[in-house]
């Protein structure tokens, strides 16, 4: 195993397929492992570069491999896809990951820390609750409109519900349903506030987040999102690369000497 220079791992939930190659790019070893057996195998390998797609479980695996002395590299799946040379299977995917990682111009994803992943989970749950809150008010608007009652857009239906029920003769079961939706809305609001408080506490412990908060007009949600998704930003060669990665610049589709910028 001393001649292994690069390992590509196709990550799965319970099975992991690896493709190993030497410095010349020649395949020297490939095998399927379970999660415990993979860690056991890599713990006995000399320190080397290990490439994976940036997908579910990849950031945990990157931290684990770094603890074993290896150099983990995460690649966006869209950059791996062009290197699949034949019919798709797990070993072919692992080989394509190796091929992509060996390119000098390849761009890699920075592995997230445990704290970043935990903060990202808070953001995703909060986003889901916000969507549920909007869905709840939309349902209430729709139910009332079916009975000829029009209420201004937004959360006005929540604050005016008692008056609406008093002024209009609605079926009892519908009134009870609307009151349940109102209670659900208030529950969602409390849950969102609780998550935002947790995000603020997490951000107080984050050095990058505190620096971001010093920027005018940057608040808790923006700072925690950037800190979670971007990290310290060392993976970007310049501020222009950061702007392009976050979608703050137009998408380019130029050909034949003609420049075309898309939205």
Task: Describe every region a protein language model picked out.
Residues 1-263:
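A detector of single, family-specific signature residues
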């Amino acid at each position: 195993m001393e001649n292994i220079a690069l390992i590509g791992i196709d990550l799965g939930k319970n099975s992991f397929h690896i493709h190993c190659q030497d410095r010349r790019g020649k395949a020297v070893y490939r095998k399927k492992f379970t999660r415990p057996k993979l860690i056991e195998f890599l713990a006995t390998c000399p320190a080397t570069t290990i490439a994976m797609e940036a997908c579910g479980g990849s950031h945990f695996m990157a931290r684990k491999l770094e603890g074993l002395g290896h150099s983990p590299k995460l690649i966006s799946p869209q950059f791996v896809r062009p290197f699949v040379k034949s019919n798709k299977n797990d070993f072919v995917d692992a080989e394509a990951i190796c091929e992509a990682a060996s390119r000098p111009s390849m761009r890699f994803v920075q592995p997230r820390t445990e704290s970043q992943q935990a903060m990202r989970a808070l953001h995703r749950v909060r986003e889901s609750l916000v969507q549920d809150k909007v869905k709840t008010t939309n349902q209430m608007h729709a139910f009332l409109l079916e009975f000829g009652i029009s209420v201004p857009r937004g959360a006005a239906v929540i604050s005016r519900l008692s008056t609406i029920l008093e002024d209009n003769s609605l079926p009892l079961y519908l009134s009870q349903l609307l009151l349940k939706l109102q209670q659900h809305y208030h529950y969602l609001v409390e849950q969102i506030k609780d998550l935002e408080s947790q995000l603020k506490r997490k951000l107080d412990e984050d050095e990058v987040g505190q620096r971001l908060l010093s920027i005018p007009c940057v608040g808790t949600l923006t700072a925690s999102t950037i800190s979670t998704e971007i990290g310290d930003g060392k993976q970007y060669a310049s501020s222009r690369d950061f702007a392009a990665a976050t979608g703050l610049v137009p998408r380019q589709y130029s050909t034949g000497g003609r420049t075309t910028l898309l939205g």
